[in-house]
């Protein structure tokens, strides 16, 4: 299972390091630090204690009995929405903040879309005494004002990025510029399984805890493995996080659900696995949404955290290999999933996670899941941050 990435950071034809020469030493330093930390039991002991006492792991695997009754299959929710801060993001930020410690870096920078990764970085920085600066697209700053306020409360400085499309892609560009200027003192804490090697590998290793716990929990609850696992996919850290420990279990179907926006037949979506082509984005070769001139296409999703024109190289590889199935759910369907989980279980999912929730209904309708099949949905985050967007879309004034 640990075949990939290879020593050059490739997953098949995807991955690698497409960055300015000036960044190479920092990436090599990071790779060396991680290789060393990965073999050090003390590093994992410290991280596991933080996961346990600060993040609140392990998260429960919850049997959604009302939703199950409604859909005719057994639906379990991996409750990453219960992690401190409200999403799976903290699993990774705590790990990388500890790595920054090992490298003697006292300043951390990060990009954020929905604000969840920015928030998780601000939390890890506050907990471990680091100076934190966050780059966030101006449009996202507007959409997620309360997350910006929370980051600032935790001592982080938030830079609204007004360049380009003013979303996640541009925030990443600005963060990379900052890093190039401040390599000595600064660790760039990337929030997903994207970017140049070793990031896709590092982030996967810190998010694997989701799948490890799930495997143990579902075996205990059901006496075996699930028939399917479903996770929403933007960059892909929550999906690879839950999929990874099941890759060798061929009988478990793995579904990566992308943001279909206003439909794959429009230009307003963020489904790079479904509709992208091979290209280079933010330092790695992967599936990218681009126009006929190879320019990155503007993306759209009701869920800010899925609004990204690329995807992790490992997921692109696994889809090509046929181990993971990529599909998409539209804004409208995600909204239905959002309402459905609230109504049946009293659980408010993030709009990102609502894509995965609704997809189970699609699988049942298509006959890809039979009555009584067991499916695990990675509930990657909670929806407090999305109440305003959802209310607006549902025609309710708050």
From Swiss-Prot:
Q: Which UniProt keywords apply?
A: Amino-acid biosynthesis, Aromatic amino acid biosynthesis, Lyase, Pyridoxal phosphate, Tryptophan biosynthesis
Q: Report what the protein is called.
A: Tryptophan synthase beta chain
Q: In which pathway does it act?
A: Amino-acid biosynthesis; L-tryptophan biosynthesis; L-tryptophan from chorismate: step 5/5
This chain's function reads: The beta subunit is responsible for the synthesis of L-tryptophan from indole and L-serine.
Reactions performed catalytically: (1S,2R)-1-C-(indol-3-yl)glycerol 3-phosphate + L-serine = D-glyceraldehyde 3-phosphate + L-tryptophan + H2O
Q: Name one GO molecular function term.
A: tryptophan synthase activity
Q: What species is given as this protein's source?
A: Methanopyrus kandleri (strain AV19 / DSM 6324 / JCM 9639 / NBRC 100938)
Mind telling me which InterPro entries this protein's record contains? Trp_synth_b_CS, Trp_synth_beta, Trp_synth_beta/beta-like, TrpB-like_PALP, TrpB-like_PALP_sf
What SUPFAM superfamilies does the database record attribute to this sequence?
Tryptophan synthase beta subunit-like PLP-dependent enzymes
| Modified residues annotated as N6-(pyridoxal phosphate)lysine in this record | 89
Kindly give the HAMAP family that the UniProt entry links to this protein.
Trp_synth_beta
Q: What is known about its subunit structure?
A: Tetramer of two alpha and two beta chains.
Source lineage = Archaea, Methanobacteriati, Methanobacteriota, Methanomada group, Methanopyri
EC id: 4.2.1.20
Known PROSITE patterns for this protein? TRP_SYNTHASE_BETA (PS00168)
* Pfam families hit by this protein: PALP
List, alphabetically, the PANTHER family matched: TRYPTOPHAN SYNTHASE (PTHR48077:SF3), TRYPTOPHAN SYNTHASE-RELATED (PTHR48077)
